[in-house]
């Protein structure tokens, strides 16, 4: 039995973390977002109704759960308020159950303006950011000039700090990028409006979590993006601006490593990626079209079509090691139901030297091609199955092979978008 569970992505994001957090949250006391911003979209389907969350922890759809947005997250206060109101329209009232770290940096309009201006200037060499200001907000944090959530509590200090930062960014926007300046007065006015709505949520969230651990409360740490987008361990420079690996939890919450507990990596039964960057198993054929359509592979934040490919076992092993994973959860198994054969990449071959890579060559991904195993498809419906014994034999063989390649057990299998479409192979909180 585990007190705390970490849930993080093993690929390039979009693995289905939100559903699994939602599935496990009914038996937890806290759900914690520890990095990223509103560039991540977690899609939940409850009783057939779809809800997309970008900042608010997924577990808050349960009335007994307390949500924490910790210091590692960069927060747009305007997007946060929009999300709170969206949930209220869906009869989820969370104002007294959501706490926001006073140390979390704010994302403000000048971050978005500079993000878009940089991408425009880079042209075909653009990174492909979501344009939400995430990277510039993290830059401000590291440069020690960020406005933080706690600054909203003191209007005089807020206005003084804001003026300095707006002047700094307007100089770049006007002089270098030839863009229109951002209005200091408009930002301040808008901040003062939202301040009152979230004022009582602003807390020392590290202290809340330390007390929860002392009281042996159950905590879920909810990751955003995926391991291969980690700023240090991902496919740089086509990465996010935070640590999406296990290490990001420690710095992003103030919770020490011995209290993390069980670390669950989420992986699709195939692979997807949004935006630019290397993708060894990427497909450009009818299978790509099939996966996109059957898997509804369009970004919940940007609406962009996701690139699709076969499951990459080399990258998966890398994620297992980087994160010290306890186990895996396989999602979207049902998407593969109609395929006659299914491939798994087990190694890479360098197109120049012909060298075979069994481990993830982080610096050489542009120069490799996948080496595949071919497995028979099951050609039977698996969607909605809730017991492992009801899966087709070929599907079970596919799952067993993934376990062998990853060298960790698969404890959860998702067979559809609803929280009930889940096979639990090991007791976690239950």
From Swiss-Prot:
Binding positions for Mg(2+) per the UniProt entry: 14, 41
Subcellular location as annotated: Cytoplasm
Residues the record lists as binding GTP: 13-19, 41-43, 306, 332-334, 414-416
Cofactor names: Mg(2+)
Coiled coil: none
Keyword annotations of the record: Cytoplasm, GTP-binding, Ligase, Magnesium, Metal-binding, Nucleotide-binding, Purine biosynthesis
First-listed, main subcellular location of the protein, grouped into a coarse class: cytoplasm
Pathway the protein acts in: Purine metabolism; AMP biosynthesis via de novo pathway; AMP from IMP: step 1/2
InterPro entries assigned: Adenylosuccin_syn_GTP-bd, Adenylosuccin_syn_Lys_AS, Adenylosuccinate_synth_dom1, Adenylosuccinate_synth_dom2, Adenylosuccinate_synth_dom3, Adenylosuccinate_synthetase, P-loop_NTPase
Cited Pfam families: Adenylsucc_synt
Sequence similarity: Belongs to the adenylosuccinate synthetase family.
Gene source species: Buchnera aphidicola subsp. Schizaphis graminum (strain Sg)
Gene encoding the protein: purA
Segments passing through the bilayer: none
Residues binding substrate, per UniProt: 300-306
Active site residues according to the UniProt entry: 14, 42
Major enzyme class: ligase
EC number: 6.3.4.4
Binding, IMP: 14-17, 39-42, 130, 144, 225, 240, 304
Protein name (database record): Adenylosuccinate synthetase
């Amino acid at each position: 039995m585990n007190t705390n569970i970490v849930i993080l992505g093993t690929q390039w994001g979009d693995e289905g973390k939100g559903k699994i957090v939602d599935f496990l949250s009914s038996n937890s006391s806290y759900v914690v977002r520890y990095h990223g911003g509103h560039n991540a979209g977690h899609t939940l389907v409850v009783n057939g109704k779809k809800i997309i969350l970008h900042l608010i922890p997924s577990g808050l759809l349960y009335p007994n759960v307390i949500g924490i947005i910790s210091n590692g997250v960069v927060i747009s206060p305007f997007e946060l308020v929009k999300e709170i109101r969206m949930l209220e329209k869906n009869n989820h009232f969370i104002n007294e159950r959501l706490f926001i770290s006073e140390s979390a940096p704010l994302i403000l309009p000048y971050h978005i303006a500079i993000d878009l201006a940089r991408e425009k200037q880079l042209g075909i060499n653009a990174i492909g950011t979501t344009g939400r200001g995430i990277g510039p907000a993290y830059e401000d944090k590291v440069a020690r000039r960020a406005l933080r959530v706690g600054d909203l509590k003191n209007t005089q200090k807020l206005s003084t700090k804001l003026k300095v930062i707006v002047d700094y960014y307007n100089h770049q926007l006007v002089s270098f990028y030839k863009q229109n300046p951002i209005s200091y007065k408009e930002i301040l006015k808008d901040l003062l409006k939202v301040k009152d709505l979230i004022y009582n949520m602003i807390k020392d969230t590290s202290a809340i979590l330390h007390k929860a651990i002392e009281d042996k409360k159950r905590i879920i740490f909810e990751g955003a993006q995926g391991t291969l987008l980690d700023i240090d361990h991902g496919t740089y420079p086509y990465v996010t601006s935070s640590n999406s690996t296990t290490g990001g939890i420690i710095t992003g919450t103030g919770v020490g490593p011995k209290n993390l507990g069980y670390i669950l990596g989420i992986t699709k039964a195939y692979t997807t990626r949004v935006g630019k960057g290397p993708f060894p198993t990427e497909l450009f054929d009818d299978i790509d079209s099939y996966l996109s359509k059957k898997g509804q592979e369009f970004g919940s934040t940007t609406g962009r079509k996701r690139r699709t490919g076969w499951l990459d076992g080399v990258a998966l092993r890398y994620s297992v090691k980087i994160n010290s994973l306890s186990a895996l959860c396989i999602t979207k198994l049902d998407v593969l139901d109609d395929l006659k054969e299914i491939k798994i990449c087990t190694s890479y071959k360098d197109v120049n030297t012909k060298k075979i890579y069994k481990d993830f060559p982080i610096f050489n991904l542009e120069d490799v091609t996948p080496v595949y195993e071919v497995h028979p498809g099951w050609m039977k419906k698996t969607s909605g199955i809730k017991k492992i014994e009801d899966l087709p034999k070929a599907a079970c063989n596919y799952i067993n092979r993934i376990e062998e390649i990853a060298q960790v057990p698969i404890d959860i299998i998702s067979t559809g978008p609803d929280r009930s479409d889940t096979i639990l192979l090991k007791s976690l909180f239950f």
